[in-house]
Amino acid sequence: MNNIRKTHPLMKIVNSSFIDLPAPSNISSWWNFGSLLGICLIAQILTGLFLAMHYTSDTMTAFSSVTHICRDVNYGWLIRYLHANGASMFFICLFLHVGRGLYYGSYMYLETWNIGVLLLFAVMATAFMGYVLPWGQMSFWGATVITNLLSAIPYIGTNLVEWIWGGFSVDKATLTRFFAFHFILPFIVAALAGVHLLFLHETGSNNPSGLNSDTDKIPFHPYYTIKDILGALIMITALSSLVLFSPDLLGDPDNYIPANPLNTPPHIKPEWYFLFAYAILRSIPNKLGGVLALVLSIAILAIIPLLHTAKQRSMMFRPLSQCLFWILVADLFTLTWIGGQPVEHPFVVIGQLASVIYFMLILLIMPTTSMIENRLLKW
């Protein structure tokens, strides 16, 4: 068995990635989220596959097919809620994974980081299109509002929106193509995740200290396999509790009303994991400006390595940067809260302030603070 593990062409890849992989001896539980994201992706693909067996992507029957899944299909309710809440777990793990990368300077692995940013965009696109499929009120109006943002692009905007819609409004053609894209994108995400791992294993994992760990490596199995299993059990427990006790906690009640193009809901808002970006979009009165801010709120991650002015990689020994990092986290929570509130005083002003603070922290305050820390350490 020992020989086949190291000689068989396929087993050799698995062995060098998950068994004999040299890993730093001091990586904490913050390094668990990569494997949790892999588990989430597999769970989403499997539950999605079973949902697709019963779902119909037609405006007349989409809503009732989801009802049929919940009422008539064996454990259909469980599959549907695992899929919906699995997306929430996916984004919780994603945000924590990105946060870990920012805190410990993992973004210095440029290829791994940039593919991670691409993955984030791909997962967000997948989740957005998936939210449209049940064809409830929030599905329809969310799709209308978000796709309409593309009309802000000069010259080609209107044509682009009508091309995406497949007509002059969100209708049957839109739903069908969104279903097709929602089905294919997770497999593209899986392929990108493979490339993400490939580049990670070229350099090896970072660690909390941010120092080179070549002198102190341990095999991935059994040390980190058992650690990942513990993380997976905790996540599965959390997801099961959510699905079995309050499956609609994170959803919008409006999505239990079939889509009606003649009746606009009082508050159109996306799922909770997009609210921070939605708040940034709404905080700018100009349409094109808002769209640019929305894209930049995520795309800004790609230039984080260029903004790294510190002489140390990790924030572990940089207390000022740590304070700013947690202010950034608090700011993102504030934006998430504002994104779910109506557009009225004082929420508008709070959203604008939080948006300015978000970009100021990343582009100006954190790099400047890192330089101050360098001076304090006489580096």
UniProtKB/Swiss-Prot annotation:
It is found in: Mitochondrion inner membrane. The chain crosses the membrane at residues 33-53, 77-98, 113-133, 178-198, 226-246, 288-308, 320-340, 347-367. SUPFAM superfamilies: a domain/subunit of cytochrome bc1 complex (Ubiquinol-cytochrome c reductase), Transmembrane di-heme cytochromes. Gene3D superfamilies: Cytochrome Bc1 Complex, Chain C. A ubiquinone binds at residue 201. GO terms for molecular function: metal ion binding; ubiquinol-cytochrome-c reductase activity. InterPro entries: Cyt_b/b6_C, Cyt_b/b6_C_sf, Cyt_b/b6_N, Cytb/b6-like_sf, Cytochrome_b, Cytochrome_b_C_euk/bac, Cytochrome_b_N_euk/bac, Di-haem_cyt_TM. Its cofactor is heme b. GO terms for cellular component: mitochondrial inner membrane; respiratory chain complex III. Heme b b562 binds at residues 83, 182. Heme b b566 binds at residues 97, 196. It is a multi-pass membrane protein. Its main location: mitochondrion. Binds 2 heme b groups non-covalently. Changing residue 258 to L: In strain: Isolate SO2Kmisc100. Keywords: Electron transport, Heme, Iron, Membrane, Metal-binding, Mitochondrion, Mitochondrion inner membrane, Respiratory chain, Transmembrane, Transmembrane helix, Transport, Ubiquinone. GO terms for biological process: mitochondrial electron transport, ubiquinol to cytochrome c. It comes from the Eukaryota. Component of the ubiquinol-cytochrome c reductase complex (complex III or cytochrome b-c1 complex) that is part of the mitochondrial respiratory chain. The b-c1 complex mediates electron transfer from ubiquinol to cytochrome c. Contributes to the generation of a proton gradient across the mitochondrial membrane that is then used for ATP synthesis. Belongs to the cytochrome b family. Heme 1 (or BL or b562) is low-potential and absorbs at about 562 nm, and heme 2 (or BH or b566) is high-potential and absorbs at about 566 nm. The cytochrome bc1 complex contains 11 subunits: 3 respiratory subunits (MT-CYB, CYC1 and UQCRFS1), 2 core proteins (UQCRC1 and UQCRC2) and 6 low-molecular weight proteins (UQCRH/QCR6, UQCRB/QCR7, UQCRQ/QCR8, UQCR10/QCR9, UQCR11/QCR10 and a cleavage product of UQCRFS1). This cytochrome bc1 complex then forms a dimer. This is Cytochrome b. It comes from Crocidura dsinezumi.
